[in-house]
């Protein structure tokens, strides 16, 4: 057991803040079907409260014995309670984390690193979302641990408003990203101006 603890310590960054623990995952891992507000987005006609952000997202999954998406999804279900970043941008962070984890990981020692570098278009409902010109630098480690297994997620997201042409962030409703957004309780509503688009409520 002590050997496992030493191995685990090596795949954590020494400069990260104290990780947030998460309770044990359930045994079942039912396939989640997306709610109707997650719809494929087409070209937006409304420019109301629409902003382009250049985003960088890194999610590093650390586990000496490998990991399953069942555990990652369980960790993300506690996201609202353990999120330590700017709450005006929590919706943006959830979108970036979901898109990053739906990509292919790059092995890095005993870590698996998911990266996202993209300019994305976000729309917030009413007066929600970040302040004009507001930027985000968010970093947090979240862990799940018991006597036999350890899984740590190191999440880093940076975002700044930019004028480069962006892409719509919503993708195939049957994608892994939509499952992860549901796990993180991403709050959206259908736009009245663009019936095929979703507005962030957080």
Curated annotation (Swiss-Prot):
Residues 12-33 are annotated as: Disordered. Its main location: virion. Residues 115-151 are annotated as: Essential for glycoprotein binding. The record marks 95 as: Involved in the inhibition of stress granules formation and contributes therefore to virulence. It is found in: Virion membrane; Host endomembrane system; Host cytoplasm. It is a peripheral membrane protein. Belongs to the lyssavirus matrix protein family. Homomultimer. Interacts with nucleoprotein and with the cytoplasmic domain of glycoprotein. Interacts with host ATP6V1A; this interaction plays an important role in virion uncoating after viral entry. This is Matrix protein. It comes from Rabies virus (strain PM1503/AVO1). The lineage of its organism: Viruses, Riboviria, Orthornavirae, Negarnaviricota, Haploviricotina. The gene is M.
């Amino acid at each position: 057991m002590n050997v496992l603890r030493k191995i685990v310590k090596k795949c954590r960054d020494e400069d990260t803040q104290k990780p947030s623990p998460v309770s044990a995952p359930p045994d079942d891992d039912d396939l989640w079907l997306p709610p109707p507000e997650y719809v494929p987005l087409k070209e937006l006609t409304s420019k109301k409260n629409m902003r382009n952000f250049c985003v960088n997202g890194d999610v590093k999954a650390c586990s000496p014995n490998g990991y399953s998406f069942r555990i990652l999804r369980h960790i993300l279900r506690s996201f609202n309670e353990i999120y330590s970043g700017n709450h005006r941008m929590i919706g943006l962070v959830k979108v970036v984390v979901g898109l990053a984890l739906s990509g292919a990981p790059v092995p890095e020692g005993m870590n698996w690193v998911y990266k996202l570098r993209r300019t994305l278009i976000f729309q917030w409902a009413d007066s929600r979302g970040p302040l004009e010109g507001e930027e985000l630098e968010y970093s947090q480690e979240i862990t799940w641990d018991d006597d036999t297994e350890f899984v740590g997620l190191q999440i880093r997201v940076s975002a700044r408003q930019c004028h480069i042409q962006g892409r719509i962030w919503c993708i195939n409703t049957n994608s892994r990203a939509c499952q992860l957004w549901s796990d993180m309780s991403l709050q959206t509503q259908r736009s009245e101006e663009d019936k095929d688009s979703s507005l962030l409520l957080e």
